[in-house]
């Protein structure tokens, strides 16, 4: 089975090295994107890659990658999605960041009031989806319980996914053996 990996905003495909080495799917496909480009253009570019995939696949997505996954999961033969600390409700940190850099495209796209986030919440999830909610790493300048980057309420604002709490912070989750074991269980059912 093919596995599509979609990284988080400040990461790259290398952030999945531990997971990918542990799972060893036949052919990993990485959907990379440019945080300086609009989310809409990134989706166009991702679809060009996915249009070449001729068989069903699972998606593993970290953080912002999970928001992208909401847009593509129902357009292809997606067997399931595992998202790690995805900010379905947007990022309060991006709202703060936009005060200091109002022209940074990533902040515009991931802000809770952005059309990218608002529209993603209107999309029905049509495949099995598990969201790993990170529970460690709280920082005081983000309002509400958070993992150092994303608030718990943002990670848990959808009603059409299954939630599982993981005692890791936003970055450690991609290095967790427990997460790998859960992913294997889901991907190879």
Give residue ranges: language-model regions.
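Helical cap/lid subdomain of alpha/beta-hydrolase-fold lipid enzymes
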Residues: 74-189
């Amino acid at each position: 089975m093919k596995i599509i990996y979609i990284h988080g905003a400040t990461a790259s495909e290398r952030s999945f090295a531990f997971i990918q080495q542990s799972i060893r799917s036949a052919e990993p496909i990485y959907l990379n994107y440019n945080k300086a480009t609009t989310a809409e253009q990134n989706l166009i570019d991702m679809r060009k890659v996915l249009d070449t995939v001729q068989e069903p696949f699972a998606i593993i997505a970290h953080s912002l990658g999970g928001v992208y996954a909401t847009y593509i999961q129902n357009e292809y033969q997606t067997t399931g999605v595992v998202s790690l600390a995805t900010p379905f409700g947007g990022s309060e940190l991006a709202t703060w960041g936009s005060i200091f850099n109002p022209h940074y495209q990533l902040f515009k796209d991931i802000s809770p009031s952005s059309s990218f986030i608002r529209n993603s919440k209107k999309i029905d999830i049509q495949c099995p989806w598990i969201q790993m909610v990170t529970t460690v790493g709280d920082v005081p300048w983000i309002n509400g319980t958070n993992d150092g980057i994303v608030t718990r309420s943002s990670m848990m604002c959808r009603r059409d996914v299954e939630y599982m709490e993981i005692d890791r912070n936003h970055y450690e989750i991609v290095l967790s053996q427990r997460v790998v074991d859960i992913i294997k269980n889901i991907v190879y059912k």
